[in-house]
């Protein structure tokens, strides 16, 4: 996958009152305009994105949850209505109902954040579903009461229409707003990575062609596929687009769910609730996959890295040897390092000092080796370094560089300065990527033999074996 860097821009910034106020006013006006343009049948909008968007904004940026910011959003709604409608005082009640949804969802999500609840838990999606349900009901009660005088419908049909619209748009938009992020780089997808999205488009087309109430569920398998393959951000965005498109297509009878009978509000009520219920499924799956992936990374991190020294563990080293970056390996040098007289450090200064020595030692070795090799703790005070190279001499030079670097590096413990030394055994030979693990194991045996020779001959030395002879 190729990536292209893109610049990032933040609309809201903490502590910038004027900037945030202008942004809230502009955003409210923009999405009020979009919703007003979708008033196709009655005075009520077919699809009202404003409340979901603003609820997501206030929920996402905790520091925006201030009375004056909410007031600015409310005033923006009133100003728009004053310019474009003749609702008069009725506008106060209708827009207050909008604020009911925004404030309810925002405060409930902010409460979850303060309680430290994970945003990528499956239960998080279910909580959002419930929050939108509660907020939509409160919004619908106030809105239906306020809009009776400007709409030809009675209270109960208005309540059903208002509730279903707020609930469906909330479930579609709020998760999208909470997860939306501008990536630092723009990925270029491969053809096979686009298959779930293509399947989603085909399923929506099938809904149009086949029709019927059941056709609204056609995109669900494709959305589940997207949830498994894509990130929660992409999944929520695709779910929102799919749900919004279906609602618009149903309202315009492009997707015919009326089965020969005249289209009515109860059918729109059912369609919206069905789409909202369907939408939460891929979001829950996506959050589940994200949680599992996060857990797997933590497990892999614990298995592949030594907790104390933060270098590879034994198993992690073997996994690293499988990396495609080592495909050009022609020669491999394996070093076994043993800190000299480490037991006396534990005996004289305590195990806490010993742990600190191991940590500092590993960090120093990692700094010397850099990206030229792999460093791992094999157990106790014994470490291994694997250096893939083209020239056999490179590994031996690296071993001596490590030995001298350790010898010259002072270690301070409780105002006492200690100097460490290390004995190194080196195994060196030809290697290829296909057999790299086997080659490593063979050279480990050779390095272990040479390490024994280094310790036997007085420690603080590097030993290697060439052509059957031992060279120090």
Swiss-Prot record:
Gene Ontology, cellular component aspect: plasma membrane
Native source species: Escherichia coli O157:H7
Annotated NCBIfam families: GGDEF (TIGR00254)
Documented EC number(s): 2.7.7.65
This protein's name: Probable diguanylate cyclase DgcF
Subunit-structure text: Homodimer.
Record's keyword terms, sorted: Cell membrane, GTP-binding, Magnesium, Membrane, Metal-binding, Nucleotide-binding, Transferase, Transmembrane, Transmembrane helix
Major subcellular site: membrane
Protein function: Catalyzes the synthesis of cyclic-di-GMP (c-di-GMP) via the condensation of 2 GTP molecules.
Cofactor note: Binds 1 Mg(2+) ion per monomer.
PANTHER family, alphabetized: DIGUANYLATE CYCLASE DGCM-RELATED, REGULATORY COMPONENTS OF SENSORY TRANSDUCTION SYSTEM
